[in-house]
């Protein structure tokens, strides 16, 4: 009898290839440890398929998971997703390489610390220029709706194949404080300012978010778009033990163990 599958996905909190860019610390402390899917798979005695990739957005995560559900169907016992930011977008370049803009928002405007900076390219510059043009006042509504729609589609696919699943946020769904910082520095126009009250209003009234809460309450933590319900809120509170360094807040080896235990406990509530 074939071993059943744990299907996992996410961004750098989940990516087995993750390696910290903080060169100020020993290489042994920058990566190479088992990530939570590997640890959780051993606990559950499941074969692990992990589609996570650092810096990816929720569209990438959902597409990878949906493809695996289509491929393996009821061979999948459990699906656990640690979702990413809503404002990360995937594109294909002329050579069909999958690239992501923005991996780190402030790097588009060249304002981030060198450890986080990505090389500016034509696509990044073109993307940043869009935010100086007025007229797209439904940008945030459409962006958030896209993430919620993908979450709903994955939940429905899991339900169809009787796959046990849970969703959690790794980082906060959308860092409106960061976008306000960009706005205050005059780098984007008024139409792209995102106030806290507007962010919560958009999330609270989104039809897909409401359906997730209605039909899959045990599988999610509602409201899952709040920082306090993210895994980052746990690692940040215990940063000395659970994160890589002062400049890199990704979970370290101990942080990955914490994530595995946290997600294992969450799965017990949907059994």
What spans do the regions from the language model cover?
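Alpha-helical cap/lid subdomain in secreted, periplasmic
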Residues: 66-253, 257-271
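Serine-esterase "nucleophile elbow" of acetyl-processing enzymes
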Residues: 1-66, 71, 258
